[in-house]
């Protein structure tokens, strides 16, 4: 079974796309852990409408929130051997679980391609990060950031690895980059699967494409 950690904060606009795509690709053999950062909109109402899915809901205090703390909290409720960290404003469009499981035998994480979407329209390619390429890679190094790269908006992990190597809770963002650089420095590998694809709806201020979302 796969466990999914969804982080949310006022995601009424997109969380339904995320949940429907999870059901489309995994069916009912799925455990979803929603870690909600005190949403004030209809996020929880939308989530509750997916009553046929196995969804656990956890609330984290907005004044105590960091991405790493939210993910670590969600991990405590995960039972699957494989954990998918996914943004509540992402929608899976292509995924081969057999390939991902095979790659996780030699890699501690497998992350995928993101397509930026705004109001149902794809953003021009000039807005796309150079990091989401069309070729699979091991231990991808981002020249722009001058460090190894991985993105928690759409990334599979081995649960046992995450339990032993939690995300650093002090960072306000890019906890995934700090994690992957630490793991590679310890001798581990991570894999970028260019055929594992999601739509990533970016926020009003473009935060997703600044590395915040």
Predicted features along the sequence, with ranges:
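Conserved donor NDP-sugar-binding/catalytic core segment of glycosyltransferases
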Residues: 95-125
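A recurrent flexible, glycine/aromatic-enriched loop bordering the glycosyltransferase active site
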Residues: 137-157
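Active-site donor/metal-binding and catalytic loop motifs
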Residues: 189-211
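A conserved acidic beta->alpha catalytic loop
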Residues: 36-45, 90
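Short aromatic/hydrophobic "clamp" motif used to bind/position activated sugar donors
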Residues: 83
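Acidic donor-binding loop at a coil-to-helix junction in glycosyltransferase catalytic cores
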Residues: 172-179
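Short, acidic, metal-binding catalytic loop of nucleotide-sugar glycosyltransferases
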Residues: 20-29
